[in-house]
């Protein structure tokens, strides 16, 4: 009997957030510390580290049953000598938190609300977000088959593709493997404005996640999160602030910490982004 394809789940894989500093007392203390100095907040602590693009960068760390863990990074003061870059239009100063990838595959993401509150921060916007759907079927090869199927109409960046012979720089295929054959396929689909700059527009990437873990990232905790499946393929969308903001405005929703743990919100955002990049219709 043929095995059914399995969907393991939709998850956040990358999360960078921008805040308003509502209560600056604790943040002001952080602006006085030197590299490697620590500031204790009872249930978590901050350690200042070197920063390239920001004046103050702190690791957010905590102790979990005797194990020291990294939650993410707090960043203050963009290093561009432009004061406006560090303030929102409403006058509040900016702060940024980047959440560790490992945390996103655990219940520890719930600590974020507590950390925000202790630092006097209020969420303003999502700076960058990766949402991924993990499943057992080779979704990259499935997408390529659909693109090349002449009996299927492809809609690329919401527009119907009518000339199949026209170059499509929005679509790229990357293969990898060993010296004898190509084993893995990665398909990338981008908005035109994202072709040269990932910081603009949305991007879809389909690839073999199990191979990527084994050959590149080494993030075994992702496989463990799904109970070590034999096959693990990923469909991943990347969004920036403008795309998330447009979705929130169109659906008349307000962003909060709870949006980040709301499966319905994440699923709807993923589906809209995916379908805006590419979708298929069988002719007839």
Model feature map: region roles:
Residues 1-284:
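Structured, helix-rich domain cores that form ligand/interaction pockets
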């Amino acid at each position: 009997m043929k095995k059914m394809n399995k969907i393991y789940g939709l998850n956040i894989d990358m999360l960078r957030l921008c805040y308003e500093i509502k209560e600056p007392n604790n943040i002001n203390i952080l602006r006085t510390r030197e590299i490697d100095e620590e500031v204790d907040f009872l249930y978590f602590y901050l350690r200042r580290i070197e920063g390239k693009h920001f004046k103050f960068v702190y690791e957010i760390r905590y102790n979990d049953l005797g194990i020291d863990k990294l939650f993410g990074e707090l960043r203050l003061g963009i290093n561009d000598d432009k004061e406006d870059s560090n303030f929102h239009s409403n006058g509040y100063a900016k702060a940024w938190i980047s959440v560790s990838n490992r945390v996103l595959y655990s219940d520890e993401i719930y600590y974020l609300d507590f950390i925000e509150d202790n630092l006097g921060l209020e969420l303003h916007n999502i700076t960058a977000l990766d949402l991924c759907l993990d499943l057992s079927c080779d979704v990259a090869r499935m997408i390529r088959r659909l693109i090349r199927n002449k009996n299927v109409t492809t809609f690329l960046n919401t527009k119907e593709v009518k000339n199949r012979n026209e170059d499509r720089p929005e679509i790229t295929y990357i293969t990898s493997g060993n010296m004898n054959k190509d084993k893995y396929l990665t398909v990338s689909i981008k908005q035109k404005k994202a072709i040269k700059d990932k910081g603009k527009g949305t991007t879809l990437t389909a690839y073999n996640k199990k191979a990527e873990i084994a050959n590149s990232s080494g993030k075994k905790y992702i496989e463990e999160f799904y109970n070590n499946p034999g096959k693990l393929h990923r469909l991943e969308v990347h969004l920036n602030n403008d795309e998330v903001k447009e979705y929130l405005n169109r659906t008349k929703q307000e962003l909060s910490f709870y949006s980040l743990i709301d499966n319905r919100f994440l699923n709807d955002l993923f589906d809209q982004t995916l379908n805006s990049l590419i979708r298929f219709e069988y002719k007839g």
